[in-house]
């Protein structure tokens, strides 16, 4: 069955004059690293190399350093429940004014780093099964979880 699917994909690529570079292809793998993610049989996970990189990230001393950290963690926000709520003390520092680092920012910084070490493997959606959406909101943020069979597919927050 795998070989039939592979042949079908390669045939469609060829029909449309697209070509796969053999040196960039991996066939028959049970997992693969792709764009900072690990694609597994069970679903999608954060690349452990990126997690280690985040854990070593020093406390930002400038707005550009903070933007870099938030950019990296924000890329993985779909893996972190209530990301927006956890990151709010840090995103508040991006507003105009003098850059100062309060205790709440230190707590948020460490909370996000810890959250990155405990991210779940997100399930791949099965469009033949029902989806469940759980929502939570307050006056300052909103969060939601999309899941199937009690397995998260993605987390959303703002």
Question: What are these regions, as identified by a protein language model?
Answer:
Residues 1-158:
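Retroelement reverse transcriptase polymerase core
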